[in-house]
Amino acid sequence: VSFEGLIQADSYWYSDDRTILSSDAVDGVDTDFGMRRAEIILKGKGPGMWNWVLGYDARSDKFLDANVQYKFNGETSITVGQYKQPNSLEELSSTKNNDFISKAMTTNMQGMSRRMGAKIETQKANWGATASYFGNEITNNESPSLGSGDGYGLRGYYAPMNSEGSILHLGLSYIDMEARTALDQSWARLRVRPDADQSNQRLIDTGDLKDADRLKTTGLEGGFVRGPFKLQAE
C-alpha cells in the first residue's frame, strides 16, 4: 500500500472589466485567496494482477479515483469504479503535471472528469485505446451537465515518436451521454470560469438548454515535446 498527497493554495489578482470576479468579499473585490485542494490518495497492489486506488479531496469534500483494476497482462486491463473518462489529454493528465494554475477553458467547459463505470483499456509502446461505459459521479458534481447521466466514451492515441525528450502524440476521443442534471432534469448547460477556478463567475455560460436529449463531444488532441520545448493543443 502506498500513500500520496497533494495540497495546493491559490492567490488570484483580477483586473475586472465586465463583472466582479472575486468569490469572497473578505478577500477584496479584485482578489481571491484560499486552499484549492487537499487530496489524500491510497493505492494498493495485489493479490496477483489486482490493483486498487481510493482518493479523496478534503477541500472539495468529494471522492477522486475510487476503483479496482485487473490487469490481464502488462498492456490490457479492466477497471470498475470511479475514474477519469476517456477524453481530453489535458483532463486525463494528473493535476500535479498541470502546466498552468488552471486547465484550459475548453477543457474545463467540455472535458469529462470522473464518473462511476467500467472500462477496458490497452496500452502499447506507441498506441493505446480505451472504451468506457459510465453513470453518475459518486459525489454530486456542481456542473449542471457533466456530473450526471449515463453514457459511453471512446479514445485512441498514436505516438509515432515516444522517447525521453522526444514525443509526438495524436489522439481522438468521443463522448456520448444523457443530458441530465443532478435533479434528473433533461437539461444541458455549459459554462466555465475565467481561468481562475476559485472565482464564482462564469464569463461563458449557455444558460439552461431545456428539453435536451444527449451531449456528444468529439475531441482532437495533439502534443509535441522536444527537449525543453512543449506544444499541446486540443
Residue ranges and their predicted role:
Residues 2-180:
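Outer membrane beta-barrel
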